[in-house]
């Protein structure tokens, strides 16, 4: 039979509380450092990239977890257009920063019920606003994702007053999408 743990002393509690507060402060500082400053005027471009099925088999920063040719083309485009204002739409983790460490996962919005996609979209839109990229009316949000990812939430961003662009909306198929990204790189 196991012996119950001894209760913490006041000194141990104080040390744990201090460690917790220091860790929280460090996490907040790291999060704040990832959010770019807001330019004084003009539109603020943000790029949202949809996740892809092909993933590495070990945990990695989100932008390295996805490994398909389509992902590489999307990522290269985002790094040219808005390198400090790029986020990832993840079926498994909602909205993530490219440097967030993610484990491999098998989840897709394809085949999900409308209610589940709507709940996902609510979480994504709510999380997006927390990044504080700037006043909603100045945000131009480019969404690079399949319809099952775009459709549930782009209207929410528009409702908040953001301009939403869907440059790949009429382009069907992975090959034509990669060709679009290649053409943008050449321009």
Question: Each predicted region: which residue ranges?
Answer:
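Peripheral peptide segments
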Residues: 2-187
């Amino acid at each position: 039979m196991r012996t119950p743990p001894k209760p913490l002393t006041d000194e141990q509690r104080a040390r744990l509380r201090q460690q917790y507060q220091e860790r929280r402060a460090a996490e907040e500082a790291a999060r704040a450092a990832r959010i770019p400053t807001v330019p004084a005027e003009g539109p603020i471009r943000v790029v949202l990239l949809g996740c892809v099925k092909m993933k590495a088999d070990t945990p990695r920063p989100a932008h390295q977890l996805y490994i398909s040719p389509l992902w590489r083309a999307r990522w290269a485009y985002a790094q040219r257009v808005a390198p400090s204002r790029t986020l990832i739409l993840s079926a498994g983790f909602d909205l993530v920063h490219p440097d967030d460490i993610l484990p491999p996962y098998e989840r897709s919005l394809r085949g999900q019920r409308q209610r589940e996609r709507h709940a996902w979209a609510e979480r994504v839109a709510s999380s997006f606003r927390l990044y504080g990229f700037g006043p909603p009316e100045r945000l131009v949000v480019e969404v690079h994702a399949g319809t099952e990812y775009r459709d549930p939430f782009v209207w929410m961003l528009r409702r908040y007053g953001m301009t939403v662009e869907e440059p790949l909306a009429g382009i069907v198929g992975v090959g034509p999408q990669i060709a679009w990204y290649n053409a943008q790189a050449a321009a």
